[in-house]
């Protein structure tokens, strides 16, 4: 019997992440390593304006502001969860007018001007979105970024070792039955979503810890 995938709608995703709240910061080792790679490879030292789609609690933005971003760099975070938005605003309050965190209605259409940003960051979001929403988000990222701006992504991904492939298969099987069981996320291949006529992939790697794999991808807007 074929099970038709059922992606979470925006309301379901909002409720899940409202419940998760601060627990989102207790990430598995593979996710923490993926975030380390993005911080290192995203050339944030030279960024002037950063947009994060799915900012969560603001923990990664805090790290960037403390250790990577220039003193004058601006930051905008968007999230579908009111709980996450509240936590992120609290975390980023020390940076005052340099930062904004806004509640998203769940749309992947970005409320920003063309070419307004030189870094666009989205981690563990594309593995939650439907294919059509993912396509829209990447179209919007292309619109929002300046030429040579960088897109930084991380996602759950199919494994590269026998244990990680087995876990990814089990995870995707559970997701097909009921995506809420796994928080709405499933393993995806980020590189397959990137249009080569629009983006040049600068870095791509898979990080595996305890059989859980994440893909990290940095692409330059052409």
Task: List each language-model region with its residue ranges.
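Short glycine-centered segments of the SAM/dcSAM-binding site in methyltransferase folds
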Residues: 49, 148-150
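A short SAM/SAH-binding and catalytic strip from SAM-dependent methyltransferases
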Residues: 119-132
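C-terminal alpha-helical "lid/dimerization" subdomain adjacent to the S-adenosyl-L-methionine
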Residues: 154-197
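Core SAM-dependent methyltransferase catalytic element
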Residues: 198-199, 206-222
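A short glycine-rich, Lys/Arg-flanked "PGG" loop and its adjoining helix->strand segment in the class I
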Residues: 135-147
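A short acidic, Gly/Pro-enriched loop at the edge of an enzyme's catalytic core
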Residues: 111-120
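Conserved class I S-adenosyl-L-methionine
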Residues: 1-45, 59
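Class I SAM-dependent methyltransferase SAM/SAH-binding core
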Residues: 51-53, 57-108
């Amino acid at each position: 019997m074929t099970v038709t995938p059922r992606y979470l709608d925006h309301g379901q995703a909002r409720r899940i992440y409202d419940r998760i709240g601060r627990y989102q910061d207790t990430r598995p080792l593979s996710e923490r390593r993926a975030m380390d790679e993005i911080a290192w490879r995203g050339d944030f030292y030279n960024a002037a304006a950063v947009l994060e789609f799915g900012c969560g609690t603001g923990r990664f933005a805090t790290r960037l502001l403390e250790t990577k971003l220039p003193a004058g760099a601006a930051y905008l975070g968007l999230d579908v969860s009111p709980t996450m938005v509240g936590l992120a605003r609290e975390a980023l309050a020390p940076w005052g007018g340099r930062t904004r965190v806004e509640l998203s209605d769940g749309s992947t259409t970005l409320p920003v001007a063309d070419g307004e940003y030189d870094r666009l960051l989205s981690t563990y979001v594309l593995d939650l979105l439907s294919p059509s929403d993912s396509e829209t988000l990447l179209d919007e990222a292309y619109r929002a970024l300046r030429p040579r701006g960088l897109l930084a992504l991380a996602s759950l991904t199919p494994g590269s070792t026998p244990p990680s492939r087995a876990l990814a298969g089990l995870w995707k099987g559970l997701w097909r039955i009921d995506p809420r069981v796994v928080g709405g996320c499933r393993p995806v291949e980020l590189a397959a979503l990137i249009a080569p006529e629009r983006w040049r992939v600068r870095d791509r790697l898979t990080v595996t810890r305890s059989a859980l794999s994440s893909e990290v991808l940095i692409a330059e807007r052409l």
